[in-house]
Every structure is written in C-alpha cells, then in structure tokens.
C-alpha cells in the first residue's frame, strides 16, 4: 500500500528483497562502518500507480501527486495492520544486516508524520486531536521496533522539528520541542531536521548559509540524553567541529556534501581541506530522484557512474604514454577535462580566451543567489595550480593557425555556447519580428554587468530552466521595473525538480515582477509612440501588448564550435589545405558540444578525459552496462 513508482526506491516488502540489501550491508561492514535503513510508508504521498492499492492516510484526502485519486482514512484495524507491517520490516532489516533501523517522521512524506500534523490528521479518536494522541502511532512504532530488534540494532528516529511555516505549521519552539520532550530517551538516536523536503534540502539560492537548520534543531540536545545527528548542507569542516564542541550535535549529517565528495570525512581527518569538493547546493542530485534516473552531481561527475562506467571520484587510469594535450577553453568542461588529464599524467596546456578562468561558472555566480556555484571553478582552479604538469594561459584566444603552430597532436575544444539574440527557442524556430526596435540583451550581457537603459524591461523565458527567473530576480533587485513572460504555465518549471519552484515564483511576486505565463512573443510593435511586445496565448486566449524598452531573451544557446569545425575539416581532407601537421585527435566537449546544465558540462569534460586513449570496447561497454532482470527468479 506504499509504492512510489515510477520513482526508483529500495523496497523491503518481503524476504525476497533481503539478498540485494545484504550485498550493501556486507560492503558497508567490510569498511568498518554501520549500515542504517529508513523504513517508510508514504501514506497519501504514495502514488501506488504500480500496485493500484488505495493509499492510506490518517484522514481521507487527495493524493500528493497529480492524479485524481484519494487516500482512504485508516480505521483501527488498518493501524494495527500497519504496526504489524512495520515490525515485520524491522525484523527483515535486521536479517539483511542493518545495524540501525529508522522510524521516519519527516518531510511530510510518511504516515507517522501525517498522523503528527493537524493539517493531515482530522481524527477524533485516540489517534487525533491532542499532540499526545497525534504522537501515539509514532510512539507505538518506536516501541514495537525496540521490542522486535532492540537487542541487537539501534532504533533511530528521524523527525522534522519545524515546518518553516511559522504559526501555520509545527514550530520547533512549540510542538516540535514538545515531541522531543515526550519521546526523549525512547529512540537510541535522534536524527533531526526541518520539513518539507524543499526546506530540508534547500538550495543555496534560497539558503546560502551552511548549517541553516541549526537554529531550529539546536534545542534537541538539551532535552534528550541520546545522541543527536543533524543536517543543513554542512560543508564547512570548521562549522562541523564547532557544532560538535558546542554540544549542538553528536554526529554530522552530510548527505549532499557526501555526494559532492564521498571522501569528505577522510579529507577532514587527514587535514586535506583544500581537496574537498564542496557541495554548491544546486540540487541537481535531487532532480534526478524526482526524474527517476541515476543520481548525478555538478561537483562530482563520477557520481552514479561508479558501476556503469567504473569511474572513481579519487582515482583515474594513468596515461599509457604521457604526452602534451591542449585544452582550449577554461569553463567547467575545460577545467574538469584539464584536471583529469593532468591526474592521468599528461602534460596539459590550458588556454583561456578571457582574463579569468571559470567560464559560465564565474558569469552565473555573479547573479543574485548563485554566488556559491563559484565553488565549481574554485576547486578545479586550485587543484590545477598545484600541478607541475599543467600550464595555464589566460587572455589567449586561439584560432586554427595558432593551434597548428603549437604542434600538439591531441586537442580538446571547450569553447562554450552563447545565448541567441533572435528569439528562437522551444516555442518558435523562426526569429521574433521587429527586434530592431528595442535594445536586445541576453543572459550573457546581464552576467557580464552590462547596464540596461531606462524604461520597462521584459524578460522572455522560452528556455523554461532556472536562469530566466534568476535574471528577473537579479534585475529587479537592482531597481529595474521587470515583466517576466514565459511560454510555460509556471515560472521556471525545471525548478520543480530542484524543489525551488514555489520560492522562485513567490520571490518574483514579492519583488513586484509582472508575470505572464502561457505566452510567447510574436513580434514587437508600436502603440501611441511606444514600443512593446505582442504576446500570444498558447491556448488561443486574447492577445496582449506590453510596453518594452529593453528585451532580455532567454530562449536557447548556440554552441561556439567554429574552432572545432575548422580543425575537423582539416582532418576530413587529411590536412591537404594545411602547410603544417594537423592534430591526430580533436574532441569537442561541454556546452560547445551540447549546451546544458553546468553539471552536464563538467560531466562532458570528465568523460573526455576518462575516454582519451581508452580501449574503445571498454568505453562502449561502459556506455551500455546496465542491470538486467533475472529469468531464474
């Protein structure tokens, strides 16, 4: 009665699920660590699209997903049955080799949490009403689990002490504290955070400070004698140590930071602080969970590729024959490619056309809310600067002739991409008419600090990613009057995957930005001597005209791949048109290959370095290596 399909989650429904989980616990134990499992029934947060079983909830209500179905209210028999299920699952967890078993009441995603919160629980029996009644099921689950496996397993309780809704939800200093006081020393471990998931895994755009949850969770150690673990995108080792020394936490929880750098604890212990790849809080990892695809990370391109491609975050295959390699362009792809080629032992020449390393990472980090993203370039630049086999040249744009003069046989081209100025994007493959009537800008202009003139600014977001709303917020914060036009039905729909969309749109509304959804810009025209944009409704609604002095187009990017194309052409004609030897290999990477997220660019750069001079058969196998269903079951 709890299935999140199509999301890919582990299951412990019956004994058949134990062997796969045992493989994990055995590996964890081989490294001297404890294995923990979080048992969860998702209540009305379940989709049950796979099982087709009606979802369960404290009170009847609509499902959390966009599907016209409701969860049914649990009766007393359902509650007894649920307790039995949970207890049996705890026993299976013990059999699978887990050392710590969780009862889960967080993120507004579990039945215990739903029972605990009045907005979900309108019962009038002993499981509803007062806090003591609403907490009853959670207390019973903790006691049931202790009884079943407490002789050999620790029982942990994950609890969101604050919903960050003020008086409209649970608050840490009121019912949140009361829950901890009422359960106090029943769990063996308190794992505390805030809810919902968008608050617990907040992006750096909206929660830039490391340890932002501490103000909500710091009371817990004062109330219980049991150890406490907490989270909050804790990336600073100094802060981690401080929280321990101050008695705020006993253990540091580092989920996203450990995705960015799985060797985070080792590097702290060994005082290798400069080698830590710090999480940037972009939530690309979260987006993959929401999409039901293998996890990935902007900072750590090996994440999710350990088995499929055999990549390791700290190790890489040494070069067969160390030789010079040229990387043209020092954005995220070029930096990562250069770093990994150097780690392999090649002599790397890194050429950057501008006076600063980092490319789009530096540009985007200049915008409001994205400063922490600069860590992507900071980490790689520092590592490259420590290496004797790397030579970096700034203010060094290279054309074909100059590349040939260098005489380097292997070239990687990471020359990025530029935003279009003609309006071509998702909704239209033809340019917007009349663009010559106003000043036209793109995110490239805004990120470089170009000053916009007076008068109303219209931002046209036909990309539907994150950047359009960032630019709108940035310009509004500078005091400009901004209107936001998008072909989507909401602002920046991609940010739903990163748990930010509501905050994004709320922020623009609070800034006074006019929002026009389901609209495309067909053309520019004049009315009463003023220039404006003609807005067309996707669904045939009434056309609108909007005054516009400056138009910022966030529609699509064009790869800056001319250098690659010219070098490739020389290879095509076997150098017949060149008086000098041509490179043996030319590889296009990053946005120059295919514009995407910064995470995509970093991955592309890493892939280029990994697969350089690799066995083609191994590369091909890595691309298609996948899990296959067994026909013997």
Pin down the residues of each PLM region.
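Flavin-dependent oxidoreductase catalytic cores
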Residues: 2-328, 332, 337-343, 347-348, ...
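Short beta-alpha connecting loops at secondary-structure transitions
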Residues: 200-206, 227, 250-251, 361-369, ...
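A conserved short coil-to-beta-strand element within the FAD-binding core of flavoproteins
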Residues: 393-406, 517-531
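Rossmann-like dinucleotide/flavin-binding elements
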Residues: 319-351, 393-407, 415-496, 538-550, ...
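Redox-cofactor binding/interface segments in oxidoreductases and associated redox assembly factors
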Residues: 103, 192, 254, 411-414, ...
């Amino acid at each position: 009665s709890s299935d999140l399909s199509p999301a890919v989650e582990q299951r412990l429904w019956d004994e058949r699920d134990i062997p796969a989980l045992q493989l994990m616990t055995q590996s964890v134990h081989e490294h001297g660590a404890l294995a923990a499992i979080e048992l969860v029934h998702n209540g009305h947060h379940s989709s049950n699209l796979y099982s087709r079983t009606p979802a369960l909830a404290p009170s009847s209500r609509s499902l959390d997903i966009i599907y016209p179905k409701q969860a049914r209210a649990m009766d007393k028999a359902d509650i007894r049955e649920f307790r039995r299920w949970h207890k049996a699952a705890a026993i299976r967890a013990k059999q699978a080799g887990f050392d710590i078993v969780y009862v889960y009441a967080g993120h507004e995603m579990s039945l215990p949490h739903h029972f605990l919160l009045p907005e979900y629980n309108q019962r009038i029996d002993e499981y509803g009403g007062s806090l003591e009644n609403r907490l009853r099921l959670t207390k019973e689950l903790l006691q049931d689990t202790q009884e079943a496996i407490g002789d050999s397993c620790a029982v942990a309780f994950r609890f969101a002490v604050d919903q960050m809704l003020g008086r409209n939800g649970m608050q840490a200093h009121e019912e949140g504290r009361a829950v901890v006081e009422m359960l106090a020393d029943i769990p063996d471990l308190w794992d505390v955070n805030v809810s919902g998931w968008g608050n617990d895994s907040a992006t750096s755009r909206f929660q830039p400070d490391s340890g932002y949850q501490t103000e909500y969770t710091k009371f817990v150690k004062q109330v219980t004698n049991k150890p406490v673990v907490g989270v909050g995108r804790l990336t600073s080792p100094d802060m981690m140590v401080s929280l321990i020394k101050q008695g705020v936490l006993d253990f540091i929880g580092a989920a996203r930071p450990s995705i960015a750098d799985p060797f985070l604890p080792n590097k702290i212990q060994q005082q290798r602080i400069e080698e830590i790849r710090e999480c940037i809080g972009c939530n690309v990892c979260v987006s993959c969970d929401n999409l039901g695809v293998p996890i990935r990370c902007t900072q750590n391109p090996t994440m999710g590729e350990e088995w499929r491609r055999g990549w390791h975050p700290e190790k890489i295959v040494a070069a067969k024959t160390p030789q010079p390699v040229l990387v043209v362009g020092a954005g995220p792809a070029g930096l990562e490619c250069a770093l990994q080629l150097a780690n392999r032992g090649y002599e790397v020449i890194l050429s950057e056309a501008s006076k600063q390393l980092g490319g789009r990472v530096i540009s985007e980090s200049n915008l409001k809310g994205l400063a922490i993203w600069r860590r992507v370039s900071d980490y790689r630049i520092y590592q490259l600067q420590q290496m004797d086999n790397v030579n970096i040249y700034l203010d060094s744009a290279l054309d074909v002739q100059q590349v040939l003069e260098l005489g380097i046989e292997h070239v990687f081209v990471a020359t990025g991409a530029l935003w279009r100025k003609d309006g071509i994007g998702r909704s239209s493959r033809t340019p917007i008419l009349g663009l010559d009537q106003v000043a036209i800008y793109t995110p490239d202009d805004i990120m470089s600090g170009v000053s916009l003139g007076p008068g109303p600014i219209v931002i046209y977001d036909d990309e539907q990613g994150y950047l359009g709303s960032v630019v709108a917020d940035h310009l509004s914060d500078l005091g400009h009057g901004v209107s936001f036009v998008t072909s989507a039905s909401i602002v920046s729909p991609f940010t739903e995957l990163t748990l930010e969309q509501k905050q994004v749109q709320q922020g623009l509304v609070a800034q006074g930005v006019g929002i026009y959804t389901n609209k495309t810009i067909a053309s520019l025209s004049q009315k009463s001597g003023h220039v404006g944009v003609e807005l067309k409704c996707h669904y045939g609604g009434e056309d609108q005209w909007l005054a516009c002095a400056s138009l910022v187009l966030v529609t699509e990017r064009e790869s800056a791949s001319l250098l690659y194309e010219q070098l490739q052409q020389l290879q095509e004609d076997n150098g017949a048109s060149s008086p000098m030897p041509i490179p043996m290999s030319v590889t296009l990477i990053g946005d120059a290959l295919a514009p995407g997220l910064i995470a995509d660019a970093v991955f592309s750069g890493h892939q280029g370095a990994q697969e350089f001079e690799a066995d083609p058969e191994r590369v091909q196998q890595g691309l298609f290596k996948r899990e296959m269903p067994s026909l013997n079951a």
